[in-house]
A protein has these predicted regions:
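Hydrophobic structural segments characteristic of membrane proteins
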Residues: 21-148
């Protein structure tokens, strides 16, 4: 049986709030790449994505916002891996390369806004577009770096 607050937490997709305990005991950060699932470590933390493992895992980041607002549209794992995962991986790398105190504050605010948009049944198109821009900026940076 799920209590009413459990249904609300699931609807707003904030059912991971118990991870605040991990933040309080220092094993997680508020902002940082999401922890990698055991079956996805090779994909999410291998190759050029290995940089994501150099910072503490967090409750929110650009990639978790991308997954939050866009990822649930693809229940099929294959489609998710094709349309959502590549951007998520680029956003994790982007976060590590651009991490800052004020950037983390902005991500916390964006996370609250994403939850509010979801609660109101709205889609944060502006956030979607900005996250794609960040991922493309990281891709452009990598291409330019590899060409030099």
């Amino acid at each position: 049986r799920i209590f009413w607050w459990g249904r609300v937490m699931r609807r707003l997709k904030i059912d991971e709030l118990p991870q605040l305990i991990n933040i309080l005991n220092g094993t997680m950060s508020i902002v940082g790449p999401r922890p990698a699932a055991a079956d996805q470590v090779e994909i999410t933390r291998g190759g050029e994505n290995a940089i994501a493992a150099t910072v503490p895992c967090g409750l929110t980041s650009q990639s978790s916002l991308w997954d939050y607002i866009y990822g649930d549209q693809f229940p099929d794992e294959e489609e998710y891996n094709e349309k959502v995962l590549p951007i998520r991986l680029k956003l994790d790398v982007y976060y590590v390369k651009h991490a800052s105190f004020f950037g983390d504050i902005k991500l916390i605010i964006w996370t609250v806004l994403a939850i509010l948009y979801t609660a109101c049944g709205k889609y944060p198109q502006w956030m979607h577009e900005k996250l794609v821009d960040y991922a493309n900026e990281n891709l452009d940076h990598n291409l330019n770096h590899n060409l030099n």
